[in-house]
Amino acid sequence: MATAETQTMVVGIDDSEHSTYALQWTLDHFFANSTVNPPFKLVIVHAKPSPSSVVGLAGPGAAEVLPYVDSDLKKIAARVVEKAKEICSSKSVHDFVVEVVEGDARNILCEAVEKHHASILVVGSHGYGAIKSCNEDSNVAVLGSVSDYCAHHAHCTVMIVKRPKTKH
């Protein structure tokens, strides 16, 4: 069981292989052989998109579709949580908390860091990167990834776990 002095690690998960790999990597590198006294309190966070963010706010018929979209998003969240629990169990890690919070993953993960006073945030990398502004004088990301956003906004160390590329 985690002690009062144990630092907190937040791991962001979604339904991607990159997220699964990041959780497995984290457990292998930080929690292997430490089932009695884990080095971190582990908090696994899944950001469930809001139905309106998936459907969009306008358009005919959007209101009728929202309950179906919400139902699907809840099912996806349940699968993500179940998979995370299975991964933890397979690695003999039993002392962890899983949270599902509705909202944008970028904000949810940064808020989880604050809420839990986390010293480290672990996220997977999809490898898309940020789409930069066309203006050469600007270094502002117009659109960016969750990992990029968290690296710049989370008030803790951010570890971005990238799956090794397969050799052809």
Regions found by a protein language model. Give the residues of each.
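Small/aliphatic-rich secondary-structure junction motif
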Residues: 2-67, 87-91, 96
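A short acidic, glycine-rich active-site loop
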Residues: 63-79
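Primary recognition of RNase H-like, Mg2+-dependent phosphodiesterase/nuclease domains
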Residues: 50, 103, 134-136
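Glycine-rich, Arg-bearing micro-motifs that act as flexible, cationic patches
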Residues: 120-153, 167-168
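Short, glycine/charged-enriched secondary-structure capping and boundary segments
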Residues: 24-26, 57-60, 113-114, 135-145
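Structural signal for hydrophobic/aromatic residues that build the beta-strand cores
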Residues: 9-12, 22, 26, 42-47, ...
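Structural beta-alpha unit
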Residues: 1-4, 28, 71, 82-121, ...
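Gly/Pro- and small hydrophobic-enriched strand-loop and loop-to-helix capping segments
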Residues: 37-41, 160-167
